[in-house]
């Protein structure tokens, strides 16, 4: 044996991947034996991203690859987030996790399913002007604030606003958060007492505003910088800045570079929004939609002010089970100081624009990037082909469902028949007397002569006429016949086997016969 050789015979040699290896995956290659790499995407955080599909080309998703040591990676955090939202039933507000794993204990990967539709960044490029209509902004506000509500309720925060992370599902016309790179655990008091692991994770990673861009950054980050911890109120303040920027074209501090100046302008901006608007003499039905949107923004700012005051009061209360403990029926429940329903309803009414509920579904409203197509022969053919394609997909899905249902019922039928056979055998075994079970040989073959003699005796017994009741003469004749049959049976059995002494009634040993035979012996002895 060579002494210079290092290692053990049972030791596994693992290849250590580098960032260059993860960044240079070739297209049309198979990853992990499941996913075909189609295209390289933009890097998100520390993860390298690729567009992939499965072998049957039915599932498409984004592959995230990241190198981490000692489970310190953002992918593990995102996998926990996706699993939690899926278990809670909120997958429609976020992307769905398809696959995840670890390669050689240092390369973390996950595949997130994508839905057909453009990103918000691409849709904003399609706007004809710098400003967005209040209907489109309200449409976006309903979906985004709903996603933020779910995030804060489940103990997560969004550390940045990036239009590339939000996508439109063209099938449901719903905006959802497609990328969870900037999502991290919350350091809120309600969530810190859940478990020690959650607490250590929240204190060991960065929880402040992620980017150095201060346009949408909350005031607490502008004031505290790196010691800032992103909270629920910070996310709502971020959405307030985003909505105002979309509808008014430019925020007052967008061109400013001084941190102190930006802080002053944001404080003044929030104070002006929280003030009461000037009274108008217009009738309520004649007020412009833009005015309604400004009122919704003011209500938004007022809700945040009230929520901050209530949170300062609740911070002084004890914590039990990971939630503040208010008085009343919700004493043990996790609560939020933000009135999400009131904020979302204001923007929802703007999208509906006073139309009846049965006139048009609010998600089918025309947005700024929607275009009307002329009814030409080419467009009609395109729509017909699309409808046929959708119909064929529905038929194939229904056929697969029926096929699975048929297989399921076949398995259930076989299982039921097996269980019935087991139960029937158990019933027969339970009802069979122990003496018969002991007397009946299992593997012993019967003599054909004995079977023939038994058949003759049985035939004679079946040929008897039915006797009358309470007739002693008939009973005596039957007993004599039984005795003769018994003698015949004993003689046939003695001839087939070794000679044995036939037990006699006077010997005292009981006969293995019926009661009628014993009575016949007693009559003959007399």
Curated annotation (Swiss-Prot):
**Tissues of expression:** Expressed in male and female germ cells.
Q: Where are the transmembrane segments?
A: none
Could you tell me which cysteines form disulfide bridges? none
Residues covered by region (Disordered): 436-526
A GO molecular function assigned to this protein is:
protein serine/threonine kinase activity
Tell me where in or outside the cell this protein is found: Nucleus; Chromosome
By its UniProt entry, which Gene3D superfamilies does this protein fall under?
Answer: Transferase(Phosphotransferase) domain 1 (1.10.510.10)
Is the Nucleus keyword given for this protein? yes
Q: Which UniProt keywords apply?
A: Chromosome, Nucleus, Transcription, Transcription regulation
Biased amino acid composition, Basic and acidic residues: 439-448, 468-487
What is the name of the protein in this document?
piRNA biogenesis factor prde-1
